[in-house]
């Protein structure tokens, strides 16, 4: 039997998603809790591995088990053994054809950026921060150069294990609400550090360090050294993973973050 789970977690509390010998990752915490509840070891497969400090709103995993339990029992039972920084939001029995990673056709990330002369301790680990003003229109113009199918080698980390740097970036939406800038990135898939590297370049343009068409030159050059430094992880959230309708994967519980209303007019599953 294949079970899918929707997971939310505070990435600031963990050293990324993927299991490590020290055991302080989201996968480690989840698999320990599953083993406690199921009384047998269970291995999870994830839709997308997130880095240290990156949060999960709509993360999806699957695992195989011989245990026959009601879907919601997996939610309550697993949550009973999870730390406060991780929670299972839903569970659903799936056909064997479902795969958390390979069945997904798109991923959406949000980035929350606090733009203010003084940092806020209340936002530590929850939002990125920059103390200088940003030009929204310049960043939108730069973002337009990045849309479509491209070789994103200039925006991947040296540790990226993706088989190809070619990805299709469907959307970059930038919205300002008060002192916050909210970014929405949607693509078929992302490279390691790709969103944070895109953020670094957009912010550099927003600060006036480069013209908007500079990002087109960076993209065409396929050289990571020509791009801006990797931006901080604090404000980055894996918000949604898209699957074919046949699997009826429940939507992410975006209402659990205070700024979710920014995207209220957008379909969570485009």
UniProtKB/Swiss-Prot annotation:
One of its GO terms (biological process) is tRNA pseudouridine synthesis. Coiled coil: none annotated. It catalyses: uridine(38/39/40) in tRNA = pseudouridine(38/39/40) in tRNA. One of its GO terms (molecular function) is tRNA pseudouridine(38-40) synthase activity. InterPro entries: PsdUridine_synth_cat_dom_sf, PsdUridine_synth_TruA, PsdUridine_synth_TruA_a/b_dom, PsdUridine_synth_TruA_C, TruA/RsuA/RluB/E/F_N. The keyword Cell wall biogenesis/degradation does not apply. Gene3D superfamilies: Pseudouridine synthase I, catalytic domain, C-terminal subdomain, Pseudouridine synthase I, catalytic domain, N-terminal subdomain. The active site is at residue 51. SUPFAM superfamilies: Pseudouridine synthase. Substrate binds at residue 109. Its EC number is 5.4.99.12. Belongs to the tRNA pseudouridine synthase TruA family. This is tRNA pseudouridine synthase A.
């Amino acid at each position: 039997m294949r079970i899918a789970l929707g997971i939310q977690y505070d990435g600031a509390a963990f050293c990324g998603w993927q299991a490590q010998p020290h055991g302080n990752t989201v996968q480690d915490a989840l698999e320990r809790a599953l083993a406690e509840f199921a009384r047998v070891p269970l291995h999870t497969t994830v839709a997308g591995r997130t880095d240290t400090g990156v949060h999960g709103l709509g993360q999806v995993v699957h695992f195989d088990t011989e245990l026959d339990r009601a879907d919601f029992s997996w939610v309550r039972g697993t949550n009973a053994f999870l730390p406060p920084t991780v929670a299972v939001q839903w569970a659903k029995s799936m056909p064997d054809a479902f795969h958390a990673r390979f069945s997904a056709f798109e991923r959406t990330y949000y980035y929350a950026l606090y733009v203010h002369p003084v940092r806020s301790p209340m936002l530590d680990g929850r939002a990125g921060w920059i103390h200088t003003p940003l030009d929204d229109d310049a960043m939108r113009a730069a973002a337009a150069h990045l849309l479509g199918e491209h070789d994103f080698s200039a925006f991947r980390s040296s540790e990226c294990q993706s088989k190809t740097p070619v990805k299709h970036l469907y959307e970059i939406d930038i919205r300002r609400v008060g002192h916050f800038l909210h970014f929405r990135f949607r693509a078929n898939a992302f490279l390691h550090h790709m969103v944070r590297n895109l953020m670094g370049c957009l912010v550099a343009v927003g600060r006036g360090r480069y013209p908007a068409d500079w990002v087109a030159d960076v993209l065409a050059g396929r050289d990571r050294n020509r791009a801006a430094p990797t931006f901080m992880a604090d404000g980055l959230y894996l918000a949604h993973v898209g699957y074919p309708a046949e699997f009826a994967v429940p939507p992410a519980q975006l209402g659990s973050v205070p700024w979710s209303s920014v995207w209220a007019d957008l379909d969570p599953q485009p």
